[in-house]
Design a protein with these regions (language model features):
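Anionic-ligand-binding alpha/beta catalytic cores of soluble enzymes and soluble regulatory domains
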Residues: 270
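Conserved beta-alpha junction segments in alpha/beta enzyme cores
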Residues: 1-265, 278, 285-438
Length: 438
């Protein structure tokens, strides 16, 4: 088959890191560099995938990047995937994001590197590659983080002190790990594409340097094992309600202990799993399928719950009385009170389906809850369906109806754009794309 690969390091020397509601500043050598890793494939159609070590790419930014790549390569916009790994220790974008100021110069440099990586991968395409896929399970370090407490409250990320009060979880976890290996004419690995669902928000108190979190350490480990020139793309799965902390256990897992660097340890565990899967993969050159399709559907926008409005009005009263309010609380208040019931109640959102060998990748431009991701994969259980979140845009958290309006973090008004009926719409879109791609 015909394929090409490229990677470009875009780590700034210093700058803000969005992701935790505060303006954390990075300076000095990165713990693990930020890369744009790209793969291009040609068969009956041509496609380009770029994995970007970033928290997210706002939709207008992703649209512009895809258009630039399309203009330079001739690959249709609909056949280009830009997947943010969702690291919480990446660089800022053009505008304020999660408490971190925008840095336009950093963002422009990042964008140029993303485009250049995609174009280089396209220009590097040549014949002689073979492809194989495998699947396994990694269930040692991912847990649902929307906890139901014994007093009936739903609390996201409750902390270990809540261990004796957790009676259940609002959602579940997808432990699947999908691995694609592309071999060169010399039968040596040229590229890995890995799909796994977990939040890359694991720097804790070490949030002083840029880091690509566990996906970056996975990449470094695979390059140490299989060769420094191997390009590794990471596509994050549906992990909007998942992270690496088992709050019910009340103890720190080995990879999260105080004397370890958590992203590095998580990278080691995922590397073990990927290598185990890889040993069972056989790459072939039997002209694998390469094609893509896109569809845009209309979704209901989110509406604030009564308790959210009440809380926002109370915060405003405190502010008007001269009390000091932390910035994160102020942002929530401003977002909630900005709701306009006379404004349009719907929005358009794109989903791309990409066939690559025996994989079908379905893209979602936000932080997808596991329940919806699993439902999308279930539309054709006999096929290898992957969900790639934070891809080609950002609409915030995407939870099922049962989570909306609750105190779960992703269900609150300020946390996302999509409202009631989203799960059914997305499952319908996934089914239609699967039928179109065959």
């Amino acid at each position: 088959m015909k394929a090409g690969f490229a990677q470009i390091d875009f780590t700034p020397l210093e700058g803000f890191m969005p992701g935790e509601g505060l303006p954390f500043w990075a300076r000095g050598e990165a713990r693990c560099p930020l890369l744009a890793s790209a793969a291009a494939f040609a068969g009956e159609e041509s496609v380009i995938l770029v994995s970007v070590d970033a928290l997210s790419l706002f939709t207008d930014r992703a649209d512009d990047l895809r258009a630039r790549i399309s203009e330079k390569t001739g690959v249709p916009v609909s056949h280009i995937l830009l997947a943010a790994t969702h690291t919480h220790t990446g660089a800022s974008g053009y505008e304020e994001n999660s408490g971190a100021p925008g840095e336009p110069l950093v963002a422009k440099y990042t964008d140029d590197c993303i485009v250049n990586a995609a174009v280089q991968a396209f220009e590097n395409m040549k014949d002689g590659f073979s492809l194989g896929t495998g699947k396994g399970i990694e269930d040692r370090m991912s847990f649902n983080r929307d906890c139901v407490l014994d007093d009936g409250r739903i609390v996201s990320i409750p902390g270990k002190a809540a261990k004796d009060h957790i009676v259940g979880y609002l959602g579940t976890v997808d432990h699947d790990v999908h691995v694609m290996r592309v071999d060169g004419a010399d039968s040596a690995p040229a590229c890995f594409i890995v799909n796994y669902a977990n939040h890359p928000d694991n720097d804790n108190t070490k949030r002083t340097h840029f880091s690509s979190d566990y996906p970056g350490y996975l990449r470094e480990n695979l390059q140490m094992i299989y060769g420094k020139d191997v390009v590794v793309l990471f596509l994050n799965g549906a992990c909007g309600d998942v992270n690496a902390f088992n709050y019910k256990s009340g103890v720190s897992e080995r990879y999260a202990s105080s004397n370890t660097y958590m992203p590095e340890e998580m990278g080691k565990l995922l590397t073990e799993t990927v290598c185990k899967i890889n040993r069972e993969i056989t790459a072939t050159d039997n002209a694998p399928a390469v094609k893509a399709a896109t569809r845009t559907d209309t979704y209901q926008l989110r509406v604030p719950a009564a308790w959210e409005v009440e809380k926002a009005l109370a915060t405003k009263a405190q502010l008007d009385a001269g009390e000091r309010i932390v910035n994160s609380t102020r942002r929530v208040m401003e977002s909630t009170l900005s709701y306009d019931p006379t404004a349009p109640a719907t929005m358009e959102m794109e989903m791309v389906g990409m066939r690559l060998g025996d994989w079908t990748i379905l893209t979602v431009p936000g932080e997808l809850y596991t329940e919806i991701g699993l439902a999308m994969k279930a539309v054709a259980p006999e096929k290898k369906i992957l969900v790639s979140e934070q891809t080609n845009g950002r609409v915030g958290y995407i939870p099922p109806d049962k989570t909306l309006g609750t105190t779960a973090y992703g269900g609150r008004y300020y946390a996302g754009m999509l409202g009631l009926g989203t799960k059914d719409k997305m499952v319908g879109a996934a089914k239609a794309l699967m039928e179109e791609l065959g």
